[in-house]
Amino acid sequence: MKTNPLVFVVSTAVEKNAGYITQIIGPVLDVAFSPGKLPNIYNSLIVKGQNPAGQEINVTCEVQQLLGNDRVRAVAMSATDGLMRGMKVIDTGAPLSVPVGEVTLGRIFNVLGEPVDNLGPVDAGTTSPIHKSAPAFTQLDTKLSIFETGIKVVDLLAPYRRGGKIGLFGGAGVGKTVLIMELINNIAKAHGGVSVFGGVGERTREGNDLYMEMKESKVINQENISESKVALVYGQMNEPPGARMRVGLTALTMAEYFRDVNKQDVLLFIDNIFRFVQAGSEVSASSGRMPSAVGYQPTLATEMGSLQERITSTKEGSITSIQAVYVPADDLTDPAPATTFAHSDATTVLSRGLAAKGIYPAVDPLDSTSTMLQPWIVGEEHYETAQGVKQTLQRYKELQDIIAILGLDELSEEDRLTVARARKIERFLSQPFFVAEVFTGSPGKYVSLIETIKGFQMILSGELDSLPEQAFYLVGNIDEATAKAATLQVES
């Protein structure tokens, strides 16, 4: 059994390789070592001592740069309050290592792999370093299969790939976290395997809500914690940038163990990948690097690649990753979301315009894309229906300027029919969520792919032209829409 390299090396290297702090700039420390005793890049350093008030200090740092003159620059994983120049720093001789395996299930960890849920220590028989290379080309698996989510707009227009990377792109307050919670609800509960959730730089309240929700739904089993199906890793908004920059790697390391050693199919949820980039930008600026476009770090593409390339499917097992991506000022050309786009197999773009109309999930059907929407993967019927829906919505979008200036009456009969069907499609793409039941008062709905295709085919064919458009709003399958239309008719 592998020992924890962190503990093992510290015990033997205390006197052998110690340095002292020469400079502190916020979360970044410069540390001087003896000549020829410099730690490697990504090595973990530990600062121990007492602050002026006499309280014990134990801060873990990670080496980022070798500066010359026997000095290194490191970034702290926790607050640097109370640190002073001259304090002793110990080189552990190894990268940061975190617990992996079944012991992580049902627990909440921080970036260092320490439990933060007040349920006692974790018996970490096996640990793993958070920095690794991506699997070799020969190990990768290229099978293509659809991952059904039960959400109509996703399954029809931008289907997810099993073992793929999915990005949920959206500005502030358009519903990224609610959508990721619904996906956890629909997929993680039905999916027999394990899930890992990485909370990267998001609200602590949301992390707490998710934990409570998982306990209620028995995804985390409080009576018998070993029967839980999920491990949670949090580095929230109040943490220093070093922790937010590395917490995604901690979650990924736990997921990789389930894939490579236990040979399982794993779900990895990350909320929010933009905060990983943002933390890297803070660290980069504090380290004295020249900023690149829009003030981001010059190493943006490299940092994103080192995380994303490890999230993949091998012949041993798969990691299906669903990542929320904050879009600053709703600008998809911003370097952070633009870099993430390149790594995604499917992109679900959330629109502020749809959210303002009250259509939830506010997924933009024309901006969202998927590499899986090919007739030879999803089948001719699915492909033709999806293309029909997109063409109808695109024509409606083109006609909106004419409608705004001249009104509906000036349109041709054919265009008026297109507009009526497009408005029904737009409303039928909305759906009540299980996780939003408390707010909407409507019970959540899971709609199978077969039901979804059938419903949109009926709208496109004109079978439902006589039904009012409000009958299609916030319903599950098409039978519910026809039942709602009958109810509306009786009421009127």
UniProtKB/Swiss-Prot annotation:
Catalytic activity, reaction form: ATP + H2O + 4 H(+)(in) = ADP + phosphate + 5 H(+)(out)
Matches recorded under CDD domains: ATP-synt_F1_beta_C, ATP-synt_F1_beta_N, F1-ATPase_beta_CD
Organism superkingdom: Eukaryota
Molecular functions per Gene Ontology: ATP binding; ATP hydrolysis activity; proton-transporting ATP synthase activity, rotational mechanism
Residue positions binding ATP: 170-177
Pfam families: ATP-synt_ab, ATP-synt_ab_N, ATP-synt_VA_C
PROSITE patterns: ATPASE_ALPHA_BETA
UniProt GO cellular component terms: chloroplast thylakoid membrane; mitochondrion; proton-transporting ATP synthase complex
Subcellular location: Plastid, Chloroplast thylakoid membrane
Cited function: Produces ATP from ADP in the presence of a proton gradient across the membrane. The catalytic sites are hosted primarily by the beta subunits.
Record text on subunit structure and interactions: F-type ATPases have 2 components, CF(1) - the catalytic core - and CF(0) - the membrane proton channel. CF(1) has five subunits: alpha(3), beta(3), gamma(1), delta(1), epsilon(1). CF(0) has four main subunits: a(1), b(1), b'(1) and c(9-12).
Protein name per UniProt: ATP synthase subunit beta, chloroplastic
